Amino acid sequence: LKRTTQLITGALLMFGAALMQAQPAHATVVKNSFLKTQRTIRTYNINKHAKLTLPKGTVVQVAGTKHLHGNKYVDVYVDRLSYNIRKPLLSVKKPTIYSHWIRAKGDNFKQIHKPSYLSYYAAQSDGKQSHGKIRTETGNLWKGTRLPVDYATSVAARLRVTTNGYLEYDASSPFVFKISPKPTTSLKVAKASQPMASGKTILTFKSRLKQLPFTKKSKGHYQLTITNAEAGTITVVPNTSKVQKILTNWIFKVGKQSWYENNSVTTFK
């Protein structure tokens, strides 16, 4: 009996290993998954109005998936990439934030975990809906503690870390935009960490931006810390008895400064 059990166990292990090997690398790719390009990919935006180039090694976030003739395809959020990649979208009349469909095969992409430099926000919850509330987790942080009621016509300082690891700062960004405008300045993240249970995302750079509260650690070694303040505010639009929207704002500390992310919206008919 013992020998039989060993044979069965061995067979199951071999079957499991074979099954894992047979499982396509793209099988677990879903909306909001992260991928890294394995070669330079030349494509378009979804309506083919702009040519786009995704250099080899670019981290992208999946906007959607589809199957065609037994193959899996993805489109990615181009607007969440650095300015040098999304720039062509800013010159077309009807820009879209998504790429054209790209085959999700190993020659094109490798699936990766969420990058540590994006740890400050819930990137993989973006777009989820529950009881009329839509999550808006895009990583855009605005200076202050609350989205203004007239946000549709207002501007403010904004920062974010792009999917491919660039810190972007815009001194006067509109709250409403289709494609993120050219930033005032930007910087490549050299390294990132998130000490366990600290609520902090520590970004390390080789230089610094004068507009933000960097800490100099040594020559060519600067840090910017984004801390979850575990507090929030709400914005009611309009702020009268006939409410149309309620937006929630989650507060962060960048250094000692207060910034916030608008992380959900509930719309009333």
Each PLM stretch: what is its role?
Residues L1-A27:
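Sec-dependent N-terminal signal peptides of Gram-positive bacterial secreted proteins and lipoproteins
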Residues H26-K269:
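Beta-loop motif signature
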